[in-house]
Amino acid sequence: DVRTGALRVQDQGSQLAALALSRVRPAAKSEIWLDLCAGPGGKAALLAAEAQVSGANMVANEVSPHRAKLLEQALDFSGLKAEVVCQDGRDLNLGQFDRIMIDAPCTGLGALRRRPESRWRKKPEDLKELTVLQSELLASAWEHLKPGGVLAYVTCSPHPAETTGVVSSHLAKHKDAELLDAWATLEGISEELIRNENRKTVQLWPHTNDTDAMFISLITKKVG
């Protein structure tokens, strides 16, 4: 049950973020996936399950030793296999990957419906520090993404500075980066989703999607 870790409760938005990366295209058995900011393990467990089904291998990274322990527990309880490492995502000592998930540290404003008190714990100056970190994590992940690979940059925030702002800045700096249509991928996963905006990135909303306000983007690295 939930107390033993055999069952886990996860918002649908978080599930869709993980599934967007795993199902953007069919996976090959030789693929290696990375969850860059994997603790405490909710999305990592779902990704590991998807990787296991497709025959891919997965590495789950978490900079915080405490959260890395929770990550290991989440995977162990689920009976899933993934190599857990504890490194700073901005300075990785790892190889190249076919798919990378970046669930970047953020303000968490997208989860206000579940944690309304968190609005009083955030300050405007927090935003600048977080967007710098988010951009650095995205740049680091890009260096470890194989040509032809796909990266998911997601946040539990609807704030443009943490979402489209970070993605647009990355695309402007990297000519080998191409934004994929994340909406098209999600529409193939859930028939209940209705595209609420005319762009390739996804911003889910509690009042229209009955999820946390999760932002989801998919970026591929061009070959050649």
Name each region found by the language model.
Residues 1-224:
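S-adenosylmethionine
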